[in-house]
A protein has these predicted regions:
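Catalytic core of pol beta-like nucleotidyltransferases
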Residues: 1-25, 31-38, 50-103
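Short hydrophobic/aromatic beta-strand micro-patches
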Residues: 46-48
Length: 103
């Protein structure tokens, strides 16, 4: 896992609590630590939210996305596990995913 993530673990935890995150994982080059470009690479997160009221999902999802982009000052890909339909993509994610937060 890249140092940038390690340095911001406490801030990540605070965002997870604020946005009712049940589980947040990192995957991709930032998780693997290889081929991550400090200047250009995005960061890929897998997120599961706790129970939310109808109509709160969009605000919560986009609020967390914006907060993570502000925290890391770079593009963030925020993926929900149930949205993954491609088995090859899921296999790729599973090869290097790491838990950052679990409630």
């Amino acid at each position: 896992m890249i140092n940038l993530i390690e340095e911001k673990k406490e801030a990540i935890k605070e965002l997870c609590i604020r946005f009712n995150v049940r589980r947040l994982e990192i995957f991709g080059s930032a998780a693997a630590g290889s081929k991550f470009d400090d200047q250009k690479s995005d960061i890929d997160f897998l997120v599961e939210f706790g129970p939310l009221k109808t109509g709160e999902y969009a605000d919560t999802y986009f609020g967390l996305l914006e907060a993570l982009e502000n925290l890391f000052n770079r593009h963030i890909d925020l993926v929900m596990p149930r949205a993954i339909k491609n088995p090859y993509f899921l296999k790729s994610i599973n090869q290097n995913r790491k838990v950052l937060y679990a409630a």
